[in-house]
């Protein structure tokens, strides 16, 4: 990732996917998604290395969703069947349900991080939900947290389980709207981690020369 092409939209990307994965989309949100500005923004993500094919698949899925006769209700059903049903039928969007940690431990750590940023879980949602973790990442970027802080949070709180989350989603429905959204944000996070790592290496090099 090139610094100039990534720095400005990073927070917006995390925030956008946070909102997309937090709860069922309303008709008003679907109207916005189908608008010219939103479609252009989504298309612009294809310029990020590694995301072009993900973006194309997501755009096709979004077009199908927007043309459904009862799109709000049908997409809500998709969301519920994927994220609201207990595993193994559904897929847990909570970090604490994955092998690297426990619900109590992850939520305790997330709650502490949210307090540091003067934030609180949205609508009483458990703080280890993928959407809240993405929102916190967006907040760290917006507040210009150190590169090391961003990198640590991304690696130790999201990327340590998000690939497993993505794989479980893909096992349920390879081309579903939410499955493709999850794949896109996970692949973006891998690219973002490499970007942050390159900045850390640059910092080390500058200190040593």
UniProtKB/Swiss-Prot annotation:
Pfam families: Nitrate_red_del. It is found in: Cytoplasm. One of its GO terms (biological process) is protein complex oligomerization. Keywords: Chaperone, Cytoplasm. InterPro entries: Chaperone_TorD, DMSO/NO3_reduct_chaperone, HscB_C_sf, TorD-like_sf, TorD/DmsD_chaperones. GO terms for cellular component: cytoplasm. It comes from the Bacteria. The keyword Cytoplasm applies. Involved in the biogenesis of TorA. Acts on TorA before the insertion of the molybdenum cofactor and, as a result, probably favors a conformation of the apoenzyme that is competent for acquiring the cofactor. Belongs to the TorD/DmsD family. TorD subfamily. NCBIfam families: PRK04976.1 (NF003442). HAMAP family: TorD. This is Chaperone protein TorD.
């Amino acid at each position: 990732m090139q610094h100039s092409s990534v720095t400005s939209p990073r927070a917006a990307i995390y925030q956008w996917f946070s909102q997309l994965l937090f709860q069922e989309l309303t008709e008003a949100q679907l109207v916005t998604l189908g608008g010219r500005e939103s479609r252009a923004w989504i298309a612009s993500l294809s310029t990020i290395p590694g995301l072009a094919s993900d973006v194309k698949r997501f755009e096709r899925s979004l077009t199908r969703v927007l043309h459904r006769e009862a799109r709000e209700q049908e997409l809500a059903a998709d969301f519920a069947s994927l994220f609201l049903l207990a595993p193994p039928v559904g897929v847990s969007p909570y970090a604490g349900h994955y092998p690297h940690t426990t619900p109590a431990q992850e939520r305790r750590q997330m709650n502490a991080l949210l307090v540091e940023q003067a934030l609180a879980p949205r609508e009483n949602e458990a703080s280890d939900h993928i959407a809240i973790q993405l929102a916190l990442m967006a907040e760290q970027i917006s507040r210009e947290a150190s590169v090391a802080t961003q990198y640590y949070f991304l690696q130790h709180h999201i990327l340590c389980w998000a690939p497993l989350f993505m794989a479980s989603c893909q096992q349920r429905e390879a081309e579903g709207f939410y499955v493709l959204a999850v794949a896109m944000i996970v692949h973006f996070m891998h690219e973002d981690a490499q970007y942050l790592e390159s900045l850390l290496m640059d910092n080390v090099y500058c200190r040593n020369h």
